[in-house]
């Protein structure tokens, strides 16, 4: 819960609406359980299991280990061919409607600034198809030597790219849960998050869609190895990949 029906919209609205018509709630965290209790959901109908997205991530991450990048991706990201070269990738995803307009202008300015400050990094941005995203991104970032604007990726190659990345900069909710399981620090380009457990556990930094905050946060992680390791080694509060097993076990016992 963000407790703001408009941020993010429509996700926060959908979560609250679905909870009203749900009988059994398989909650990803203890904090999520507390949120449901505060909305008068019966304690007996809430089961803390972790999030099934981590189960899927772990499955796909194992597949990604033995699946090479396609020739098309290697063409777009030629530095991936240099497997013997130490490289740091900053992976970017951004699509939130809350950031349309001034927000994406600030985000793109921040990325441009970081690319100049750190010419040794590679910034990879699979650009969302929405024209409200593509226009400012292409206008402000096309042609920058170490910024790679590519088409959206399927899930398996995206997970493989997450594994290869050093830091992830995103406005996505799901990536806030997934990336910490891969040991990747996450900087979130939003002012609020429905995943406060990530912030509390130290796996996520909230920077907002603000140029100065984004630059400062990413630069700090790129230059301070201790700060980087602290985030990379923090425990993911969203589970260990066994949520589906726990859910199945509950359903089998409940409806036996």
List the model feature ranges, each with a label.
Residues 1-125, 130-256:
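Nucleotide-activated sugar donor-binding and catalytic core shared by glycosyltransferases
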């Amino acid at each position: 819960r963000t407790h703001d029906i408009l941020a993010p919209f429509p996700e926060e609205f959908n979560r609250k609406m679905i909870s009203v018509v749900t009988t059994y709630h398989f909650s990803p965290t203890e904090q999520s359980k507390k949120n449901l209790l505060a909305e008068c959901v019966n304690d007996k109908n809430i089961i803390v299991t972790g999030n099934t997205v981590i189960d899927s991530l772990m499955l796909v991450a194992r597949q990604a280990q033995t699946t090479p990048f396609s020739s098309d991706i290697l063409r777009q990201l030629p530095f991936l061919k240099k497997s013997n070269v130490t490289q740091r990738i900053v992976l970017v995803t951004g699509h939130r409607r809350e950031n349309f307009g001034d927000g994406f202008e600030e985000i793109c300015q921040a990325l441009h600034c970081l690319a100049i400050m750190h010419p040794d990094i590679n910034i990879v941005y699979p650009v969302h198809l929405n024209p409200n995203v593509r226009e400012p991104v292409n206008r402000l970032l096309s042609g920058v030597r170490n910024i790679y604007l590519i088409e959206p990726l399927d899930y398996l190659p995206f997970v493989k790219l997450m594994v290869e990345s050093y830091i992830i900069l995103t406005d996505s909710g799901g990536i806030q849960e997934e990336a910490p399981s891969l040991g990747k620090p996450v900087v979130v380009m939003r002012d609020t998050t429905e995943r406060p457990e990530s912030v509390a556990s130290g796996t996520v930094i909230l920077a907002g869609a603000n140029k100065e905050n984004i630059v400062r946060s990413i630069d700090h992680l790129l230059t301070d190895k201790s700060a980087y390791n602290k985030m990379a080694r923090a425990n993911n509060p969203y589970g260990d990949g066994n949520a589906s097993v726990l859910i199945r076990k509950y359903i089998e016992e409940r409806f036996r």
